Amino acid sequence: MTISNTRPITPELIASHGLKPDEYERILSLIRREPTFTELGIFSAMWNEHCSYKSSKKWLRTLPTKGPRVIQGPGENAGVVDIDDGDCVVFKMESHNHPSYIEPYQGAATGVGGILRDVFTMGARPIAAMNALRFGAPDHPKTRHLVSGVVAGVGGYGNSFGVPTVGGEVEFDARYNGNILVNAFAAGLARSDAIFYSKAEGVGLPVVYLGAKTGRDGVGGATMASAEFDESIEEKRPTVQVGDPFTEKCLLEACLELMQTGAVIAIQDMGAAGLTCSAVEMGAKGDLGIELDLDKVPVREERMTAYEMMLSESQERMLMVLRPEKEEEAKAIFVKWGLDFAIVGKTTDDLRFRILHQGEEVANLPIKELGDEAPEYDRPWTPAKSPSPLATNDIPRADVAEALLKLVGSANNSSRRWVYEQYDTLIQGNSLQLPGGDAGVVRVEGHATKALAFSSDVTPRYVEADPFEGGKQAVAECWRNLTATGALPLAATDNLNFGNPERPEIMSQFVHAIKGIGEACRALDFPIVSGNVSLYNETNGQGILPTPTIGGVGLISDWARMARIRFAAADEAILLAGAPEGWGTHIAQSVYMRDVHGRTDGPAPHVDLAHERKVGDFVRGLIADGLVTAVHDCSSGGLALAVAEMAMASGIGATIEAPAGHDPIAAFYGEDQGRYVVTVTAEKLEAIASRARDAGLSLPVIGTTGGSAVKLGDAKAVSVEELRSTHEAWFPTYMGGDLAPDN
């Protein structure tokens, strides 16, 4: 059914477009008349949270975004960071949460496709992908279906496109029952002097449509992504886009080939709000108007209206401002790759966004007010409240060995092999570390020694307990995971997933998490260069756990010295860098409390950023000098889980002493921050100990590698074979239709 552009504008229609009454009044004052139906759709798309960041912009400005290596920070399709030798890494993380809940395969697949386009739009060839996934409780009736669809979608698109998936996260919690999270990360390599931007320059230049044809899929997708769900969720299935990775691969090659010709003045991928957002952003950034003739847009469906064409989120499409003299050369490239190439408009000097369709003007709007001058809110938020500490006598006991087996086989700590074996982790032939370690590592092609490390991290239960400390911890753990490979952390991207910002308690979570993220990034010289905000992650008023995911990139100057988590050999000393007295103290909000005792009370662990930096720099120095044989950061599950993971990765056991006079539960399962487990050969032990003394760092020897079991203090030994079988069993058992007991 076609929709007339003269459809009456009623309060119900305005509300259905996600516009508040005061926002509609602002529209009337801007254009001094009633908008057409197409214009209402354009305002709805550009003024929603997904495109305008109207609730978050104020706080995003407080984040550190500059640094000596930063070539491009937030505001472009992706961030760009210098990695020496004239090379740069281009990267970003973005959410596709709402579509993936409604239609998990296509939602996840097009999330991958969208983030890859963000990267190659800048002129970079994608070299790595990650995904951070959050699902509802394992026993929820939709969870297994959603896991299956999302993982298949991520793999189906990424594998076909030809980019290795080198890391990510998968976590379950009942708070995601009605609103899962799919956060997709991509990184690419480019030359520092060949970066392409979205700012249009020059009047009267052709605006060119590139890629696949436009259909009705995804119409209204950006508006849907800016609202919480209710019982009408199934009706939103048509707003989910459909992806074709093979077309995207052709689009990548065509764009990179075109970029070498000097034809491109500005280029923008068509993501959220499709043709509308890409055209408005290009024009508004360049202080230019844009005129589009929709009769020239390649379409794959009949009788498409102006409203549908402007708001379609059909995938694998680009918009470009072209040098006129290069038109035939550019067209030939896209024809060769089997893609559409159509001049659909021109740049103008009047700062108007003008849309023509079938000989009529269907929209004529001020472009700056649609783009970078959209509404901005300073939403109310409540002061932070920190939970009371747990009393010493309120820490429940459990057998240390039995707790370890329970944790390694639990829903949230078990092996993710079932997931990542569905992804191509080796394509392109440059992967050096695969999922399952602290960070994925990819060799920089064409360079003998250089590699890049990638990690994504957040601990939502910490953010829920204390958004400020949780925000700090997300950054610190990402930085720590990169460091644990030997990489120098360069910069980060954020994917900020929260509930309804109109609720002051949710806005408070957001504000304090941003403050924590900013403080940590400044302390660790880890600027935020790109990112995404996803709000209204709620269903029927039930919000998700606050989940500000941090994706980070680090540089390894010599990958031959790169560290791994697996024990290298028997009879090596195990040390705990950055250990507090007693090795571990903070048991509140730990997975021990959550998964063994079903409790999520108490404060999040404090992150001492000066300590974090000092210990991380020290460990990175040990790795660079070849003094350690294995490294693993201590995070969820504490020392016990870190040692178990190192043993399972290598097949070599470990004996850990219990710290005299200290609680073994806190020592083994405490989640104190800023710690690394390292292993050292006997002949290098004294040299490392001397370094630690000179640096004023705690570096106790806590045990020895060897044997076929892991023994923690006085607890019974658990064989590595039993740990492995328990660790590997949960996911395939669950996905096979049997819910593992007690999880």
Curated annotation (Swiss-Prot):
Residues at the active site: 50, 96
Reactions catalysed: N(2)-formyl-N(1)-(5-phospho-beta-D-ribosyl)glycinamide + L-glutamine + ATP + H2O = 2-formamido-N(1)-(5-O-phospho-beta-D-ribosyl)acetamidine + L-glutamate + ADP + phosphate + H(+)
E.C. numbers: 6.3.5.3
Gene Ontology process terms (BP): 'de novo' IMP biosynthetic process
Keyword Magnesium assigned: yes
MF-aspect GO terms: ATP binding; magnesium ion binding; phosphoribosylformylglycinamidine synthase activity
Positions that bind Mg(2+) 2: 118, 269
CC per GO annotation: cytoplasm
Record's keyword terms, sorted: ATP-binding, Cytoplasm, Ligase, Magnesium, Metal-binding, Nucleotide-binding, Purine biosynthesis
Family matches, as InterPro entries: PRibForGlyAmidine_synth_PurL, PurL_linker, PurM-like_C_dom, PurM-like_C_sf, PurM-like_N, PurM-like_N_sf
Binding sites annotated in the UniProt record for Mg(2+) 1: 94, 532
Metal-binding among keywords: yes
Chain positions recorded as substrate binding sites: 95-98, 117, 241, 313-315, 534
Localization annotation: Cytoplasm
Binding site for ATP: 53, 92, 494, 531
Task performed by this protein: Part of the phosphoribosylformylglycinamidine synthase complex involved in the purines biosynthetic pathway. Catalyzes the ATP-dependent conversion of formylglycinamide ribonucleotide (FGAR) and glutamine to yield formylglycinamidine ribonucleotide (FGAM) and glutamate. The FGAM synthase complex is composed of three subunits. PurQ produces an ammonia molecule by converting glutamine to glutamate. PurL transfers the ammonia molecule to FGAR to form FGAM in an ATP-dependent manner.
NCBIfam families linked: FGAM_synth_II, PRK01213.1
Entry protein name: Phosphoribosylformylglycinamidine synthase subunit PurL
Organism: Sinorhizobium fredii (strain HH103)
Organism lineage: Bacteria, Pseudomonadati, Pseudomonadota, Alphaproteobacteria, Hyphomicrobiales
Gene symbol of the encoding locus: purL
